[in-house]
Amino acid sequence: GKNCTSRSGAVIGGEPQDDDYDGEATRVVVGGNCQIHEHVTIHRATGEGETVIGNNVRMMAGSHVGHNARVDDYAVLVNNSAVGGHAHIGERVILSGQSAVHQFCKVGRLTMVAGSCMVTRDVPPFSIITDTHPLRWRSTNKIGLQRNGFESDERDAVRSALSKLFVNEINRDSVAEELAQSDYDSVVEIAQFVRSSTR
């Protein structure tokens, strides 16, 4: 992409750390206006597919994106955060320092992952996630929602939806079915995320 910066020691398109990789000609696609800081590594894909970095992504020193992963627009990977192979990081997600996302996991848009947190399951949009064992939903990303134009009534609806999901983890499917009937697109997005989750 245009207008990207890459600092010293960054490696973009290196061979993936995957035993299934057999030398195939795969690639990394980087969008525009990205900031790639010192010693960042972005591995190209294994097999078919691509490793994709969206537009306006900021990857701070030592952060890593594994093979076949996708990082959407405006995401921020803070120092030494890592994204495993085939993982999907949603738009405007913040991965705090030393955090990691396990392979094949999805992190929904406008989510903030706390420092040193290990994400081993899919995380719905608009969340703040802390701890590791077990992964714990702390709250709605209220500041992120405010900064992105969500009115107070919609923020309240998102908070209520996420609270229902995390209180009723055993009945997530029935909660998702209820949320899918919401008048708010953001709440419907949460329901769709849960329904499509595989982890």
Question: Over which residues does each language-model region extend?
Answer:
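Structural signal for interior beta-strand "rungs" in well-ordered beta-sheet cores
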Residues: 1-135
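Terminal amphipathic alpha-helical/low-complexity segments used for targeting or macromolecular assembly
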Residues: 3, 9, 14, 20, ...
